[in-house]
Amino acid sequence: MFISTRKFAAVRAFGGTFRSKSTNEFGRHLFKGAVAAPYLEWRGLSRNTLDTVDWTRDPVMTDKVAGAVLDWARDNGASVYCHWFQPLGAAGVRHGQSAQVQNRMFEFDKDGNQIWEFKGKNLLQGETDGSSYPTGGLRKTHTAGGYLGIDPTSPIFLRDDTVFIPSFLVSYHGYALDEKTPLLRSVDAISVHGSRLLKKLGYDVKGLTCNIGLEQEFFLVPRDPYNTRMDLQLTGRTVMGADAPRGQEMCDHYMSPPSVSGAPYSCMKEIQEQCFKMGIPLKTRHREVAPGQYEFAPLFGFVTTQIDQNLMVMQIMDEVAPKHGLTCLVAEKPFNNVNGSGKHNNWSISTTDGVNLFNVNQLAAKSGSREIFPVIMASVIKAVDEYGDLMRMSIATPGNDFRLGACEAPPAIMSVYLGDSMTHYMESYMHGSIEPYDPSTKVLNMGHTLPSIVIPNEDRNRTSPFPYGGHRFEFRAVGSAQNTSLVNTVLNTIVANSFKEFADKIEAGASPREVTQDALKKHWRVVFNGDGYDPACQEELTKRGLWRIDSCVDAINTYVSPKNTALFEAMGVFAPDECAARRNVQLQHYVGTVEMELKCMLDMINQHVLPSMRDANVGYVTELEEAVATLRRVWDDVHHTEDLGEKAAKARSLRLETMVEARCICDSAEKVCPAHLWSIATYKDLLFIDQTLS
């Protein structure tokens, strides 16, 4: 029987008058644009007031903005505000490691009556104990002042009953005690020096800014098995565990369809819905390469806003997952012998009116010159070649020691991928042949039945740490648990330095073309389009003299090399004392991570593995007891080492050698121990979530 679709069409018109609940609520908890406009206008302000930082310098306007925020908060059931900031060392066990001080937006009079009060001074500034966060020696208990100030470049948002005010944290003497302050300084540096360079090239702009897009990878595992694993609970990583019978052998996890009735699907939907309310545009979701691994990716945006949003995404993932019987793991390498997780940092520079400096056609159209683009590209090439050690330092997290160069992430050798067409263009320019670069798309003819496919001008290179992807560079080596403020601080700073040096030379009389060609000839070695996973290619890059720092500890120490402290100081990003402090914080973080992992391993061996082995009578007991004694002896040496750099180096050796030897014994025992006697969840229990929760 034929059933007409007319009734359906009348209710839900073709072309989509229907909108989902989540899209209808997009940005309703973000104090920006159409949401903020009526509250600002009610207070006599323009709907564009928040578009600049000028309002923060006018006490009258500040009070009015605070009043508008209060009205909006009350209308949404909020009564608490916090200055939300990013302490030093913001990566690791606590996802992103943000912090906040919460205060009520009302007081009480002598009769107990509630009085709503939220003034400009409350909005602009807060205070906290600066000595209770990692400071690397910049603050002590008897000199503990820490001062919070609003970051007007990142919008205020609301979650539950709390208004979040994105903020920076500095000491009594103005030292940066957080991750955001140097990031904002680096944006200023690239704007000042980049604008000066562009002016020398005949393109007058008001300023520059940086945009990023962060691809967030993570694992979702069943919560009940997770609760049997002390290592996952306390460190985010398994310190033991035999491989499951199935892993990535069939390459059948990546992009495979999620089960719409499964817990991961409903969990990811709720995460997106919560993010949409706060104006976080999570556009893409999909399965990743490893079993139980997934990814979210947002639309691009201003660097500080994107980082703030990513920190909140990690927090929301962490909080929503248990509601669906799951746990979210964002550590770089939670499981052995399957892919780890990263956070690809897609980075670009644009003028304040939206012209992307990496988009050759857009830049040429707006500036009237095709001579600017090769100068910009040469600036990046120069920066990576000179300061690849700083790029490596910016991704030197404990988890990345297991991930980089393991055929799942780029090697720890800093090179640049340009693609064939761009390489030919820049190489020709370097040798004096000025050819036009027209990155037009290509069309693949698929025959008579299938439609033609339009593809980009350049192929993808997933083995490069820093490939050019058309209009952006993608830093692919970033760890999944990282706050990417330091990553982008480094990128901005090293390129700002190139801009400054180019502008200085042009001002001294050199032609832009001469400056660019000289830089390309000097730094062309850093351009590499080959297979970064190939050991022969890695050997070639090492012979070229590129920055190769395999150890995270060695990379962290480059923070205080003379050339790097001089760079940061010259660009106004870090004082030398701030560099030294951050180096100390990162090394302490590394040692602390190893200590926690070791203690978990020892407890799990003594409380679970050895009893199971004895009950099952499977052998290995003597070997494991000897391994435990070795672990304790080596850690005792680490613990009593005074020099922090030496201590971290010893901790790394303990982690990657001594602990691995103990793990091998545990994993061998697991393989032969009867399942009913093994009290720790296995990789099979944790990774194959569709089978576990079906």
Placement of each model-derived feature along the sequence:
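Short linear, low-complexity motifs centered on an aromatic residue
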Residues: 90-117, 123-125, 130-131, 136, ...
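Histidine/acidic residue-rich metal-binding segments in metalloenzymes
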Residues: 18-119, 125-140
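Hydrophobic/aromatic-rich, well-ordered segments within soluble, folded domains that form packed cores
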Residues: 78, 82-84, 307-323, 349, ...
